[in-house]
């Protein structure tokens, strides 16, 4: 979240708390009127303040047989602030939250049924198989980072002649978002160790100490890198990824380089972790499975084209060396929705 969107989101939260009518405002979008009926109205928002864009779509509820919404980021400590906005969700048949710890307080703010929908990844694009490019990048530290860990890795990389990749500019836009994701996948498929910490690990003033699983875990495992970092202290983390999927270290870890050198003494374990992560992404965390959860909530099923993608994902998973039939996903149990067929 950049500073402008941060200020906008906070301002709307405060206004909606004291002025309920804010929830009926159109923030400036061109008004659209649905002129025919649809089977499903699907809305995906990053923040609760984005819900105001619904006011720019006339007759969306009357014209759509079912309606499902996804809210990526809503922290439990913020639910009371957005009660005015939450009433916009009452018309949905189901609401999915990307923060599992927020389900209980949200259920008290909205009458809409709600459940957890974890982040996902384009597992087919990120999969390193069958090509298996050489992992020439020693460490990839993407996005928010600990200055302590970063300084330690810089010195370690200089001393040992390792390749340490990290962000050097603060960019909020991309020339081409599809090319950006393609390049990210290419980097991770060539990375040995990928740093992943609990979502917004360094912004406790936003999370109020709530620990959630962020996108980095899904991207890193899908690309076959070994995850290193601070996982969220939540009971469902292992149900999402399985045991021994990452090397837990403090978010602030000045001697991480030495830890990585010690891990390299057991290449067999690292290879098992890599293949477990890739297999897990292909069978549990591709966006196909998230979309299937959305459709299930609406009483709908996947298209034949989506089923073809499922077959391709299973075919890639078979290349990891473990029979697909022996890998049973308990993701849907963690998400509190039925397991996909």
What are these regions (language model features)?
Residues 61, 136-138, 245:
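Residues that mark the start of a beta-strand
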Residues 73, 119-122, 251-254:
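Short, acidic/turn-prone active-site loops that include or flank metal/cofactor-
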Residues 257-261, 265-341:
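C-terminal amphipathic helix plus adjacent low-complexity
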Residues 173-176, 209, 245, 266, ...:
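Generic anion/oxyanion-binding catalytic loop in active/binding sites
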Residues 1-37, 43-56, 77-239, 288, ...:
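Nucleotide-sugar donor-binding catalytic core of glycosyltransferases
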Residues 60-74:
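Active-site proximal beta-strand in glycosyltransferases
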Residues 215, 251, 285:
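Residue-level signal for the nucleotide or nucleotide-sugar donor/cofactor binding architecture
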């Amino acid at each position: 979240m950049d500073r402008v969107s941060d200020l906008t989101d906070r301002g709307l939260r405060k206004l909606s708390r004291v002025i309920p009518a804010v929830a009926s405002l159109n923030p400036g979008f061109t008004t659209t009127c649905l002129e025919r009926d649809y089977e499903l109205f699907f809305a995906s928002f990053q923040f609760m303040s984005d819900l105001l864009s619904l006011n720019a779509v006339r007759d969306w509820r009357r014209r759509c047989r079912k309606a499902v919404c996804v809210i990526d980021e809503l922290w439990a400590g913020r639910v009371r602030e957005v009660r005015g906005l939450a009433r916009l969700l009452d018309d949905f048949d189901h609401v999915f939250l990307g923060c599992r710890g927020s389900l209980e307080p949200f259920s008290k703010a909205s009458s809409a049924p709600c459940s957890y929908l974890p982040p996902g990844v384009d597992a087919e694009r990120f999969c390193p198989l069958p090509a298996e490019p050489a992992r020439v990048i020693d460490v990839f530290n993407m996005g928010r980072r600990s200055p302590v860990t970063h300084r330690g890795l810089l010195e370690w990389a200089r001393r040992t002649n390792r390749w340490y990749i990290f962000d050097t500019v603060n960019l909020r836009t991309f020339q081409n978002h599809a090319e950006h994701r393609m390049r990210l996948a290419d980097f991770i498929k060539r990375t040995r160790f990928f740093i992943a910490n609990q979502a917004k690990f360094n912004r406790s003033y936003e999370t109020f100490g709530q620990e959630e699983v962020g996108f980095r875990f899904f991207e890193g495992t899908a690309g076959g890198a070994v995850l290193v970092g601070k996982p969220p202290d939540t009971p469902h983390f292992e149900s999402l990824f399985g045991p021994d999927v990452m090397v837990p270290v403090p978010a602030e870890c000045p001697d991480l380089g030495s830890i990585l050198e010690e891990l390299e003494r057991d290449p067999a374990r690292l290879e098992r972790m890599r293949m477990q992560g890739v297999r897990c992404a292909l069978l549990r965390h591709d966006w196909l499975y998230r979309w299937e959860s959305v459709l299930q909530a609406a009483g709908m099923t996947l298209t034949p084209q989506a089923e073809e993608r499922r077959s391709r994902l299973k075919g890639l998973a078979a290349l990891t060396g473990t029979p697909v039939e022996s890998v049973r996903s308990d993701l849907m149990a963690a998400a509190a929705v039925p397991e996909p067929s």
